[in-house]
Amino acid sequence: MSNSQANAGSSGSADEPTLNPSGSATLVPNLTTTNASSQATPASTIPQQQQPQQSQPQPQPQPPPHIVGASTADAGGGVGVVVAGGSEGVNLDSSPRESGDDSEDESEILEESPCGRWLKRREEVDQRDVPGIDCVHLAMDTEEGVEVVWNEVQYANMQELKSQEEKMRQVFDNLLQLDHQNIVKFHRYWTDTQQAERPRVIFITEYMSSGSLKQFLKRTKRNAKRLPLESWRRWCTQILSALSYLHSCTPPIIHGNLTCDSIFIQHNGLVKIGSVVPDAVHYSVRRQWDRESAREQERERGAHYFQAPEYGAAEQLTAALDIYAFGMCALEMAALEIQPSNSESTAINEETIQRTICSLESDLQRDLIEKCLNPQPQGRPSANDLLFHPLLFEVHSLKLLTAHCLVFSPANRTMFSETAFDGLMQRYYQPDVIMAQLMSGGQERQYRLADVAGADKLEKFVEDVKYGVYPLITYNGKKPPNFRSRAASPERADSVKSATPEPVDTESRRIVNMMCSVKIKEDSNDIIMTILLRMDDKMNRQLTCQVNENDTAADLTSELVRLGFVHLDDQDKIEVLLEETLKAGVMSDGAGAESSGAGVTTTATMAALEQLERNWSISDADKTMGSSMSSPATAMMYVPQDQQQYQQQQQEADVDQSGTTSN
């Protein structure tokens, strides 16, 4: 199955998307995303490069700095970025760059992250007055070769940063754990205190190159097209699915800045919300602006951001604030534009809102929006309740349920590798494949795939389900994380190590394939075990540790689960693999050639856990599995049973075919 359509931000073409009957846009950018991180080093700033004189001729104009994505490291989700804004794409209405000099100026590297992975560029991102975010630039992910967004929150002084640092870190650490297909991803954050008079919090978010929903609605209105009700329903369902996920977190996360400018639509109809401004960031992290300038800014933003009546007066934001904002977004999506009653004013008042609601043709559409815009916060429904509104609720078809079972079932994600899954699709996704045989009146009738209407779009449908275009709203959605009361700093260790080890996050990904080998070091006769895991998000994880003859497979597996290296449900099959490896390797004195591990390139390495009696070395990568295991005498490989049956059937079919040919 093709992986060219990923629900992630990256560089790509800035062509204008157009609406098709299915509610999708036809823009097809190259998309990649990553969830790998690197160990931090002290922050540093790259000096600006000297620009060439204008009088010197350029040998060849440079193309616009749109970097085509490399390999896909995380196709499903990764920890989210819903957080604090700045994930928006460059304004698609702006004119293209006219010369190579302009391209070089915007591609100039201004700064790098402490870990050296992200490079801040001069090119700014149109972030549309996201409150609390002072500076937004495009940046390059040097490990994945894709564009990301560099966001900065500036403090008035060092004292203000220190007073809010603990709360800020707690908020951002929680946001790092978010994982939802309709939420823009959040990659990393750190603090910069090198300049005491200008301390900053910097965070990296996913770059959405396809543009915002606001831009899409403007182009749709310019082309004199009405948004189909089915597209409106699909977009509302995806937005509410993301809000329900945020509000179900413990503690709940309030978006605080939901508008059509902070909602992004991709080429396949996938909708993502970004520019999250949690209450801790909005009220505590941002600079202490002058009251007059703050009020002026609120008046200016009133023309673009539709906030609940209680916004600003409440001491603490609630989920009802996001529901009101969603109602305004739903109204704008249905009407394509909310025009002020007075041509001389850009403010949106109650009269304008009611006139726009009355212009809608669907009674159910008006009812849903009016419930969201209830002036009383306690009278507004929750995001989960809105998913069961008569206009949005539907009994899912067997086709959709089957696709979700095929794509998201833990058993299928574990038992089928991507190669085996693609092989099955190629084998059974053919027009002449017999889907059913019915006996009627003593006669047999066969139904083939070609007889089913729309079967030619089945592969695309399964792919859209995988990327979150068709969520299941009648069942419990993805369970959000329960945040810890305190999280460790991502960029610096505590100066005094606690006697109690920090809690370790559990692994949520499942294992698709795994290999294990043991070898004896020639200089010390130490037994080294290496485990290579293929996760369901296409990432590889390599684990290495020293073992002895007293170690058992059960003890080793329990330790892997306790440290959060593997999923609890994968414990049994890992234990079987380790037991077979120890029997073949340790008990036979480690016979066999030594595994060299050549060809493996890691993208992140975690420090060994010193407080444990055994030190595990772990590295994550997105390369192929087989390159690090070169010794068949000491390596064991786990092959799912269904994949074994499929391979056996393929071999038998090949034998039958060769026998028929020879005859």
UniProtKB/Swiss-Prot annotation:
<keyword id="KW-0597">Phosphoprotein</keyword>
<dbReference type="InterPro" id="IPR011009">
    <property type="entry name" value="Kinase-like_dom_sf"/>
</dbReference>
<feature type="region of interest" description="Disordered">
    <location>
        <begin position="638"/>
        <end position="663"/>
    </location>
</feature>
<feature type="modified residue" description="Phosphoserine">
    <location>
        <position position="498"/>
    </location>
</feature>
<feature type="region of interest" description="Disordered">
    <location>
        <begin position="1"/>
        <end position="112"/>
    </location>
</feature>
<dbReference type="GO" id="GO:0005524">
    <property type="term" value="F:ATP binding"/>
</dbReference>
<dbReference type="InterPro" id="IPR000719">
    <property type="entry name" value="Prot_kinase_dom"/>
</dbReference>
<dbReference type="InterPro" id="IPR001245">
    <property type="entry name" value="Ser-Thr/Tyr_kinase_cat_dom"/>
</dbReference>
<feature type="region of interest" description="Disordered">
    <location>
        <begin position="481"/>
        <end position="505"/>
    </location>
</feature>
<dbReference type="InterPro" id="IPR050588">
    <property type="entry name" value="WNK_Ser-Thr_kinase"/>
</dbReference>
<feature type="compositionally biased region" description="Acidic residues">
    <location>
        <begin position="101"/>
        <end position="111"/>
    </location>
</feature>
<feature type="compositionally biased region" description="Polar residues">
    <location>
        <begin position="19"/>
        <end position="46"/>
    </location>
</feature>
<feature type="compositionally biased region" description="Low complexity">
    <location>
        <begin position="81"/>
        <end position="94"/>
    </location>
</feature>
<feature type="modified residue" description="Phosphoserine">
    <location>
        <position position="495"/>
    </location>
</feature>
<keyword id="KW-0963">Cytoplasm</keyword>
<feature type="domain" description="Protein kinase">
    <location>
        <begin position="122"/>
        <end position="392"/>
    </location>
</feature>
<protein>
    <recommendedName>
        <fullName>Nuclear receptor-binding protein homolog</fullName>
    </recommendedName>
</protein>
<feature type="compositionally biased region" description="Low complexity">
    <location>
        <begin position="641"/>
        <end position="652"/>
    </location>
</feature>
<dbReference type="Pfam" id="PF07714">
    <property type="entry name" value="PK_Tyr_Ser-Thr"/>
</dbReference>
<dbReference type="GO" id="GO:0005938">
    <property type="term" value="C:cell cortex"/>
</dbReference>
<dbReference type="GO" id="GO:0006888">
    <property type="term" value="P:endoplasmic reticulum to Golgi vesicle-mediated transport"/>
</dbReference>
<comment type="similarity">
    <text>Belongs to the protein kinase superfamily. Ser/Thr protein kinase family.</text>
</comment>
<feature type="modified residue" description="Phosphothreonine">
    <location>
        <position position="500"/>
    </location>
</feature>
<dbReference type="GO" id="GO:0012505">
    <property type="term" value="C:endomembrane system"/>
</dbReference>
<dbReference type="GO" id="GO:0004672">
    <property type="term" value="F:protein kinase activity"/>
</dbReference>
<feature type="compositionally biased region" description="Low complexity">
    <location>
        <begin position="47"/>
        <end position="57"/>
    </location>
</feature>
<feature type="modified residue" description="Phosphoserine">
    <location>
        <position position="489"/>
    </location>
</feature>
<dbReference type="GO" id="GO:0042803">
    <property type="term" value="F:protein homodimerization activity"/>
</dbReference>
<comment type="function">
    <text>May play a role in subcellular trafficking between the endoplasmic reticulum and Golgi apparatus.</text>
</comment>
<feature type="compositionally biased region" description="Low complexity">
    <location>
        <begin position="1"/>
        <end position="14"/>
    </location>
</feature>
